[in-house]
Amino acid sequence: MKTKVLLIGPECFNYNQSVASAFCSDEFEVKIIDYADRFGQINLLNKFIYFLSTTRITATSKLLAKLNRYILNTYNLYRPDIVFIIKGDVIFEETVLKMKESKNILWMLDGIFYNPNSIKLVDKMDAVFLFEKTDVEPVKKTNINTFYLPPAFDNKIFKKIQVKKDIDILFIGILHTSRIKLLEKLHAEFPNLNMKVFCKRYWFYKMPLKYLKSLMDNIFINKYVTPVEANILYNRAKVCLNMHHEQSVYGINPRFFEILGANALQFVDHKPFIEDFFSDHNIRTYKTEAELFEMIRQQFSNNPPQDDQRLYDTISKYHTYKNRVEYILEKV
């Protein structure tokens, strides 16, 4: 008989599906509940209720209560052996307290102290896995079964493919103000390079003028990129930029692994994780804008080889979601 897993997490870049697929299908049966932090269950009705509401805070409160009722109803009907919660920022404490017949796991894919609702779940978990290594010791005071666990990549999606490398510089991700400033400076410094930035920022119903203007922008592309599309873009790029959120201290983002999984060349801002785990590999890191600009200048002047088979082999062997799921199951 297969072990039943109920996986609950935010709908973001298909991470829930990637984690679910990492469970061995011969041994595990996985049911997924995707959610949105503003309107709970992902369906058209909830979106209408939220966006048409005159008081969105109240609407969100009601929709998240509805989500928690749905989670408990699913739990009671499905009767999982393991509840695997990713982030869990919208899951109520009382919801977890009623999950008495299962092993309950929390995995954070960003800093837990930026998610106060997630912190409230810590003492109710059988094990907690954290994005930030610096968060482990403080959280251990509440739950001794707390471990550092970085993200990973889905090796069924991110892989090397044979396509023409027609993009010089590529960035995919959320455009915070600091990132926009850096990318604009980068384009101004290297105007002859083919630079592409993908991020869904504007919707017609919210900002019609900015949306229409974005249709004519050939650099900042107003588009959500699926994981499959991201893999193609990484393979097309000569240089993939990776900039971590300012909140990241030690933790490394999933794109670090996804770009390497596509066997693409990555220029990434320096993080201690890279020193600790990849010191004997040629990871291209920078600490300042000046260093990044010089790296790009040298790359497009000398055009050194991009493929690194040894690095790709390391990533594929140790940093897939299958590796992470196996580690989690060992701990619980």
Mark where each language-model region is.
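Conserved acidic donor-binding segment of nucleotide-sugar-dependent glycosyltransferases
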Residues: 282-289, 298-302
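A charged, aromatic-enriched C-terminal amphipathic alpha-helix characteristic of glycosyltransferases
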Residues: 300-332
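Active-site proximal beta-strand in glycosyltransferases
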Residues: 82-87, 97-111
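Catalytic alpha-helical scaffold of carbohydrate-active enzymes acting on polysaccharides/glycoconjugates
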Residues: 72-76, 96-98, 114
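An amphipathic, basic-hydrophobic alpha-helix
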Residues: 58-80
